[in-house]
C-alpha cells in the first residue's frame, strides 16, 4: 500500500490571518507543516550606465522603493556613492506583480531595517512604487532592458543574467 503525499513550497510561512493554513489543509487534506528547506538570498539589481558599483544604505533603499527618492542623482545616493557618475534621470523601480515569497522577504527586510521609512508590513504583494513584472525571470529581463532601473530579485536570477547587483546593503 502506498500513501499519496501532497506537498508545496513557499519562501514565506503561511499567514493565519489570511486563512492560508486552513486553505492548505483543505487542499491537501492534512495539516500543513512548516519545514525550512532552503535559503534564497535576495539581490538588489540595477541598470545605470557608467555605474559599476553602487552602495545603498537601507534607509536610502527604502526611500527608493517607496517612491520618496525619484532620481539617481538624489543627494542621499550621491553621498553614499561620491565617486559614481550618477545621471539626473528618473529611477525606474520594478517589483514582482505576482504574489511572491521574494517580495514578502524583501518587504520584511525593509520594514525591520528601516521601519520609520518603510512603514508597510511585509506582504507577498507589493505596496511600494514602480512597475510590475512577472516572476523572477521577468524582473531580471525588465532591469536588463530598462536603463536607470532598479529592483529586487532572487540571487540566482541576478547572477545567471549577469545583472549589476548592489551587493553592499548597509543597515
What residue ranges belong to the model's regions?
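Short amphipathic alpha-helical patches
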Residues: 20-25, 84-92, 129-133, 166
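Second-shell loop/turn segments in exported
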Residues: 31-32, 46-52, 90-96, 126-130
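Short beta-strand->loop
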Residues: 64, 72-76, 80, 88-99, ...
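Ligand-binding pocket segment of bilobal, Venus flytrap-like solute-binding proteins
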Residues: 1-6, 99-171
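Short mixed-charge
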Residues: 73-85, 116-126
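N-terminal segment of the mature folded domain
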Residues: 1-78, 86, 140-144, 150-161
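Structural signal for conserved beta-strand scaffold positions within catalytic alpha/beta enzyme cores
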Residues: 36, 95, 167-168
Amino acid at each position: 500500500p502506498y500513501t499519496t503525499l501532497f506537498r508545496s513550497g513557499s519562501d514565506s510561512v503561511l499567514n493565519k490571518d489570511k486563512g492560508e493554513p486552513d486553505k492548505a489543509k483543505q487542499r491537501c487534506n492534512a495539516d500543513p507543516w512548516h519545514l525550512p528547506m532552503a535559503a534564497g538570498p535576495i539581490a538588489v539589481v540595477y541598470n545605470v550606465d557608467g555605474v559599476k558599483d553602487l552602495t545603498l544604505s537601507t534607509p536610502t533603499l527604502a526611500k527608493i522603493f517607496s517612491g520618496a527618492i525619484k532620481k539617481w542623482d538624489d543627494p542621499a545616493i550621491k553621498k553614499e556613492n561620491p565617486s559614481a557618475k550618477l545621471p539626473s534621470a528618473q529611477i525606474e523601480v520594478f517589483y514582482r506583480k505576482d504574489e511572491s515569497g521574494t517580495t514578502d522577504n524583501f518587504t520584511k527586510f525593509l520594514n525591520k531595517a528601516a521601519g520609520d521609512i518603510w512603514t508597510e508590513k511585509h506582504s507577498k504583494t507589493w505596496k511600494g512604487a514602480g512597475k510590475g513584472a512577472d516572476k523572477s525571470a521577468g524582473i531580471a529581463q525588465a532591469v536588463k532592458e530598462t536603463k536607470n532601473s532598479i529592483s529586487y530579485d532572487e540571487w540566482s536570477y541576478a547572477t545567471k543574467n549577469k545583472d549589476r547587483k548592489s551587493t553592499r546593503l548597509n543597515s
